[in-house]
Amino acid sequence: MLGSSRVSKRRPLGAVAALMVVGLTLAGCAGGAPAQNADQGSADSGNITWWGWTPDATPAEAYIKAFNKVYPNIKVTFKKLTIDGYDAAIRPALASSVGPDVFAVAPGAANGSVDIYGVNAVDLKPAVEKTLGADWESKLAPIGVSSLMNGDKLAALSVGSVFSGTIWVNKDLFDKYGLTPPKTYDEWKKVCETFKANNVGCFVQGAAQTAFNEDTLQAITDNVAPGVWEKALKGEVPWTDPAIVQALTIWKKLFDDGIMQEGALGMQQYPDANNGFMSGKYAMVMMGTWYMQYSTIEGNTAAISGAGVADPKPFTQLPIPFPDVAGTGNVGALYGDADFGLAVNQKSKNIAAATTFATWLGTSAEGQQVVADVLNDIPALITTQPNWDTVKLVNPEVQRPALEKLISDSGKSTEPRLATVVADLQTAIGVASTTVAAGEATPEQAAATLQASAAKIK
């Protein structure tokens, strides 16, 4: 029955891609949208390339394997680039005639910005409407639709969303030294003192990769005064607001009190902090829901191996709320965006097959179930949940309740992460984080400089 249901859903998606191609060709002839390649290819066969900085190899292979059970004649080749190298690679590729057929874009001003590269993408609204019906927007997570628009064009289909605000802990290390994950600032300091006394790193952050500093600063600010960070992003309160100054002060204390590791300002979150945590050298790391994938035996083993460990042995990792560092009791805040979207290159010679792949992974029940079960993203199709009976966790009894709660809490969050942060503001926030940490500016001075930069962005 499983195979039959997959085959029965294959033709409608192919038909969607074919119908979309006709519409795109007409639009190009009418002079509305940029003209598409005359040869759009088949919706059910062909060789397509997919570029992205995410997902990791294991999720990507799972997505493609499941897709090929439904579309065996479409070969998908995934090319993973580094986060910092993605823009430099994708920009000339899209300008050429030999770029990828499918490419990743993301909300906001970070790598793969949909605002920048969405102009190179096919409008996927006709394909989604044919697949899900006229009420398609009600079936997909709103944050994944609104944040991947480029003007009036749906430039990409969200595979799923990610949320930050959590710290991930190596439970095995905590258990080994009789420790409990910290809930307050003082507890965090004491935990770090114990780990250091046993020659184990406590908390690790790649503070040189400043987009991830935003996650930590947003968590601290939400702890100080919920909602102020989001209001500052919208320009509703100045960046000199007392809550943000206090957050920068606490940020500095993390460095001064030894919670943040030595040399943090010279480390990247990827690969440095990630590898430090996965190799067992550090017990805690600031990461979001995308880290759920490493809760599985396969995902954890692959990540440990990728961190350079020769004989990887899975460990129990758990998400915990960001500690109550301000002593306010305001804990558990989560903020997120679409993780990434699959965009179809307007210059592709395989637009139909590429659209079939993007539409299947982002909107079909089968595709979204694979996304849910891999635990890399929280699915875009709102009716989809992980099938826990088939998800092989390292320590199901402990991890499953924590992951279920994280997924549930994420679904209730409306606070954005990076989607509303323009490039100049992201740079200014990064400068504030590093100058305060290095002692080159006081929290008050950094907040004033940040506000001055924000005031110029209109």
PLM feature segments, named:
Residues 53, 250-350:
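Extracytoplasmic/periplasmic substrate-binding proteins
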Residues 123-140, 224-246, 300, 305-313, ...:
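Short, solvent-exposed loop/beta-turn-alpha elements that line the ligand-binding surface or hinge
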Residues 110-164, 216, 312-320:
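Hinge/lid segment of periplasmic solute-binding proteins
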Residues 66-140, 176-183, 283-284, 302:
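Extracytoplasmic "Venus flytrap"/periplasmic binding protein-like
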Residues 43-55, 74-79, 102, 155, ...:
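Short, well-ordered beta-strand elements
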